[in-house]
Amino acid sequence: MDNLSLQHICYLVLLFFVFSVLGWCMEVLLKYIQYHRFINRGFLIGPYCPIYGSGIVFITVMVSILSGMESSVGTTFSISFIGCGILEYAVSYYLEKRFHARWWDYSTKPMNLHGRIWIGNLILFGIGGTLVIEAVSYTHLRA
């Protein structure tokens, strides 16, 4: 992504929507396994959780910006871990102030920050972001 062309913007928009839907599917599936019934995990009308789409777009852009530097799996994991943590905290804070409600609360889990982010999810986001970026890179190299 040397320059921000229409093709790059379309790619990022596609990533946003695909991963918003996949994130919603994952959350609904996890809650179905936990409670044995359907629970809509989105706060919007429709099957998507925009925080997942925003996260993957953020990771993709940051890895692209830093690609001129030494790029590694560790760098991608760090960007995913830290970036998703900042994004999740900011979104949680905004939603609480704007709508006077909390969409998630990790306060009962160890190693959380104000109940907004939790180390366990950050590790999963780091791994997930790394897997997605590596898969996308591998796919682009083969194309």
Question: Where are the language model's segments positioned?
Answer:
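Alpha-helical transmembrane segments of multi-pass membrane proteins
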Residues: 20-24, 56, 60, 81-88
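Short, strongly hydrophobic alpha-helical membrane anchors
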Residues: 1-8
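Functional transmembrane or membrane-interface alpha-helices that line membrane-embedded catalytic
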Residues: 4, 34-77, 95-135
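C-terminal TM-helix exit segments that contain a strictly Trp-centered aromatic cap at the helix terminus
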Residues: 87-95
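A structural feature that tracks compact, well-ordered secondary-structure segments
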Residues: 20-24, 28-36
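Conserved small/polar residues in nucleotide/adenosyl-binding loops
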Residues: 139-143
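Interfacial segments of alpha-helical transmembrane regions
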Residues: 15, 73-83
